[in-house]
Regions:
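Donor/substrate-binding cores of folate-linked one-carbon enzymes
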Residues: 4-126
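Internal anion-binding site segments
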Residues: 121-181
Length: 181
């Protein structure tokens, strides 16, 4: 039988019963500096919001969404032209060593004492799932915000606008790259 559940990019909350099936419970690799950006799309929202840094966090799992004690955390700078897939790949590479380090912390754990660092509830922010509608560019936003949206919403939902032409159906235009300046 397994001693530990390891979860990465899993869109569900595991119950206490599921976590109790292994002596050490479970750990979760999350693509943000928890407690910031709890939820399904942390990398997208970090770029969209113009954050200068993000990272990965490994938590000991509890039934609260991304709310368990922090075992490992690594911070990285978000490059100004980096897209979501590029940043996600970098974070994924960092995550491997963080998961291994967290597993070593649990190796001698007694299963009852608190392990890790409790998250600061006053610092919690959400990273909800994206919707297709969020990809529509709002032209009243700044050029920098539109650039961040295009970078953040790749590959889905993408960033798009509508071209209205006289006596024709509206044409949906998808933006794939932007440069401010």
């Amino acid at each position: 039988a397994a001693d530990l559940l390891v979860v990465c990019d899993y869109g569900q909350i595991l119950s206490n019963e599921a976590l109790a099936t292994t002596p050490l419970g479970g750990i979760n690799l999350h693509g943000s500096l928890l407690p910031k950006y709890r939820g399904a799309a942390p990398v997208h929202w970090a770029i969209y919001n113009g954050d200068l840094e993000t990272g990965v966090t490994v938590i000991h799992m509890t039934p609260r969404l991304d709310g368990g004690p922090i075992l490992e955390r690594v911070t990285v700078t978000i490059e100004s032209t980096e897209t979501m897939p590029q940043l996600e790949a970098r974070l994924s590479n960092l995550g491997r060593s963080c998961v291994l380090s967290a597993m070593l912390q649990l190796e001698d754990w007694d299963g009852t004492s608190l392990i890790g660092e409790l998250q600061d509830a006053s610092q919690v922010s959400k990273a909800p799932r994206l919707t297709k509608e969020q990809g529509q560019i709002q032209w009243e936003q700044s050029a920098e915000q539109i650039k961040n949206q295009v970078r953040a919403f790749q590959p889905w939902p993408g960033s798009y606008t509508w071209l209205l032409q006289e006596a024709q159906e509206p044409l949906r235009l998808v933006l794939g790259d932007t440069r401010v300046g």
